[in-house]
């Protein structure tokens, strides 16, 4: 049974996660979460140390996966697939993902939400500038000074698409400049 007016939470959903026609998706990672099948039937693989590494890798007593993982139970505006957006990773400039791929041009889709700033705030809360970071692919910045809150507010789904050329068989995603903490 659902709470009264629960359906209002789905009013402004968009098909953000639907795979783009004409593309073969090699990796879908649920950053900070377990395997997840979205409303389009697409599998998002568990985030683990097969592809990612964080600051915690420098400490033998810490699990490098769990050390930079968090979750929220808040509903996510703009998507029916809340669970995918409710898990996230952080790790400043030491968080990175490495994917073996054939050399060539790749379309990379990033999905973000602001999980903390604005929690419990009124509609007039302004959290712009409290989380700013760069996203790089193979050492080239593709998203400069990304401010998730400025893009979609608190608990709003945000999608960014970039293109990158891979040489050497490895697609590396990292965060070379973190001015105020990232959340993926």
Regions found by a protein language model. Name each.
Residues 1-184:
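Compositionally biased, intrinsically disordered or flexible polar/acidic segments
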């Amino acid at each position: 049974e659902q709470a009264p007016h629960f359906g209002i939470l789905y009013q402004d959903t968009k098909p953000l996660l639907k795979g783009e026609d004409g593309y073969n998706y090699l990796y879908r990672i649920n950053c900070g979460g377990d395997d997840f099948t979205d409303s389009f039937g697409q599998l998002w693989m568990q985030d683990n140390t097969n592809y990612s590494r964080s600051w915690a890798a420098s400490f033998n007593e810490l699990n490098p996966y769990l050390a930079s993982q968090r979750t929220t139970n808040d509903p996510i505006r703009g998507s029916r697939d809340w669970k995918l957006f409710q898990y996230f990773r952080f790790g400043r400039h030491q968080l990175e993902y490495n994917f073996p791929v054939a050399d060539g041009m790749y379309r990379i889709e990033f999905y973000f939400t602001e999980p903390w700033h604005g929690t419990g705030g009124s509609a007039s809360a302004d959290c712009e500038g409290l989380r700013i970071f760069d996203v790089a692919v193979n050492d080239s910045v593709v998203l400069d000074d990304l401010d998730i809150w400025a893009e979609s507010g608190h608990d709003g789904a945000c999608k960014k698409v970039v293109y990158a050329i891979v040489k050497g068989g490895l697609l590396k995603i990292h965060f070379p400049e973190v001015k105020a903490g990232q959340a993926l």
